[in-house]
UniProtKB/Swiss-Prot annotation:
The name this protein goes by in its record: Small ribosomal subunit protein bS20
Disulfide partners: none
UniProt keyword Ribonucleoprotein present: yes
Superkingdom in the source lineage: Bacteria
GO MF: small ribosomal subunit rRNA binding; structural constituent of ribosome
Reported function: Binds directly to 16S ribosomal RNA.
Family as reported in the entry's similarity comment: Belongs to the bacterial ribosomal protein bS20 family.
Keywords: Ribonucleoprotein, Ribosomal protein, RNA-binding, rRNA-binding
Record keyword Oxidoreductase present: no
Protein species of origin: Neorickettsia sennetsu (strain ATCC VR-367 / Miyayama)
Length: 87
């Protein structure tokens, strides 16, 4: 339990930051899910468009500190690889 005023304030700040980070990660996951769904059902153009929309969102996660840059690159690389394999 936080004893000092500054420690109590830090607990409040961490709670706020955690909530924001959870929302950001949820948003990123939603975009990735949309791309995967487009790859599974739609034509190649729809999947490519979904990735084009998702890519800035994924890299924004890196900028905001919720994703490691290598993980973001891996996600984008794998999704684009799946799109390239589409007929």
């Amino acid at each position: 339990m936080a004893n000092t005023a500054s420690a109590k304030k830090m607990v409040r700040k961490i709670k706020r930051r955690t909530l924001v980070n959870k929302m950001r990660m949820s948003r990123i996951r939603t975009f990735v899910r949309k791309v995967r769904k487009a790859i599974a059902v739609g034509p190649k153009s729809a999947a490519a468009e979904a990735l084009r929309v998702a890519q800035p969102e994924i890299h924004r996660g890196v900028t905001k500190g919720v994703l490691h840059k290598n993980r973001a690159a891996r996600i984008v690389s794998r999704l684009s690889g799946h799109i390239k394999k589409m007929a």
